Amino acid sequence: MTSRTAQVSRITNETKIQISISLTGGPIERPQPSLFASEKGANTAGPDDASQTTASQTIDIHTGVGFLDHMIHALAKHAGWSLIVECIGDLHIDDHHTTEDCGIALGEAFKEALGAVRGIKRFGSGFAPLDEALSRAVVDISNRPLAVIELGLKRERIGDLSCEMIPHFLESFAEAARITLHVDCLRGFNDHHRSESAFKALAVAIREAISSNGTNDVPSTKGVLM
């Protein structure tokens, strides 16, 4: 199995994003040079980051959108990834470009780190509760990008993240990662809980889908998943 690591940089007129990822956790190198070392007057990484370092994982997320940081942190933690995300976006406009582009960049990093779709289970599913909320996620590492997201969110915003951008982040991730993704919140009345349980369920599903199936075969009747 490959090292399952990747570094991705996505630079547009709207956002600057750098990502380092290890799908198996462990030590991870921070992108160099850091965006926050070179951008004066931009969003500055600090104690409000979604950061966590343990013996098995390093996670440091700074998108400039607090609730988005929180969701990506939950995804990385429960998927078993080490993940560093740095983003400087045009938040003076709104949160759309930052959220969408972070989803795209994370999907690209995931795809690159996974490498050839060979010797993995391919399919994964997961349930995750958070108090009264319960979500289900089903993943197919298929090279057939599609996302069906039903979270049933009622609020306009959670913190500084527009609720309409939460499913859009997942759609952007699935498109760039080239996976088929179904995520549903089955019940719950607190939109924070509904969203977080969805990201945790996705983490469980991805962790299963990319786990070894004990062979070196391509898990497809076609013989290819490119």
From Swiss-Prot:
UniProt-listed Enzyme Commission number(s): 4.2.1.19
Metabolic or biological pathway: Amino-acid biosynthesis; L-histidine biosynthesis; L-histidine from 5-phospho-alpha-D-ribose 1-diphosphate: step 6/9
EC supergroup of this enzyme: lyase
Pfam families noted in UniProt: IGPD
Region annotated Disordered, chain positions: 23-55
Catalytic activity: D-erythro-1-(imidazol-4-yl)glycerol 3-phosphate = 3-(imidazol-4-yl)-2-oxopropyl phosphate + H2O
MF-aspect GO terms: imidazoleglycerol-phosphate dehydratase activity
Annotated InterPro entries: IGPD_sf, ImidazoleglycerolP_deHydtase, ImidazoleglycerP_deHydtase_CS, Ribosomal_Su5_D2-typ_SF
Keywords: Amino-acid biosynthesis, Histidine biosynthesis, Lyase
GO BP terms in the entry: L-histidine biosynthetic process
Family: Belongs to the imidazoleglycerol-phosphate dehydratase family.
Protein name (record): Imidazoleglycerol-phosphate dehydratase
Gene: HIS3
